[in-house]
Amino acid sequence: MQQKFGGRLGHALSFLRHDGGHFAQFVWSRFQHDRLTVTAGYLAYVTLLSLVPMIAVVFGMMSAFPVFQTLKQAMEQFVYHNFVPTAGEMLKEYIDGFVANATNTTAVGIGALIVVALMLISAIDKNLNYIWRSTQGRPLAQAFAMYWMILTLGPVLIGGSIAISSYIFSLRLFGAESLFGIGYLLLRSLPFLFSVLTFLLVYTVVPNCKVRLVHAFIGALVAATLFELAKRGFAIYITNFPSYQAIYGALATIPVLFVWVYLSWLVVLLGAETTACLGEYEKPVSEELA
């Protein structure tokens, strides 16, 4: 299995080195044809509407596992610091207030929160499957099971990964005396590695068709790299050109959040398009290697 994956990965990288220009043009033409800039705007809008319900549901799922109660704060700090540039603290304050209000609702309100959260996952599912030209819909029971699995297992997997990371970093290997050695490098690379893993899971689980693991891995690498570049570039812009604060005042967090969510979805969709295009562009060779 590892030999097969390594062979396919090596072939794919060799193919990209020799025909990377044509492949980039192919991806860009598909990106424009699929109007992914419009799709990113739609998903950003749906995400902002569903953000509080999704977080409320996720934290509700985590509360069912007492071991994750102590990790909630660590998860929040990790996510806001590494995935929401510059506005993390202010955004955390607002979202905590919204979630506190949402979790005090009745059973009907909680049901509505779950429905809205599922609607977000459904929108992601439909738009990503359009990129893969997958027109065959999932049966309702299968779709609901997949959505519910994401809502329930997602917090468990994230909490588990952070728990493992916390345990590793507590070892003597990552003490102060080795902070500038291998421990420091691994600590700095954790956001990138988590991004690669997240994109890899999305590009393999969400499409309602067969996706080669090597293609999903390359797409995840592309998306994770672009995500890190976008995060740093956006943080530099927000820090050095704070004119948006003079324009929007106390509401400045809203456009900042919307633009960042929009850029994030552009990255996700471009990585998905890269993964799908690898399957189309390399189809004859893939059939030979099968």
Curated annotation (Swiss-Prot):
InterPro entries: UPF0761_bac, Virul_fac_BrkB. The chain crosses the membrane at residues 48-68, 104-124, 144-164, 182-202, 216-236, 250-270. It is found in: Cell inner membrane. One of its GO terms (cellular component) is plasma membrane. It is a multi-pass membrane protein. Keywords: Cell inner membrane, Cell membrane, Membrane, Transmembrane, Transmembrane helix. PANTHER family: INNER MEMBRANE PROTEIN YHJD, UPF0761 MEMBRANE PROTEIN YIHY. Belongs to the UPF0761 family. This is UPF0761 membrane protein ASA_4118. It comes from Aeromonas salmonicida (strain A449).
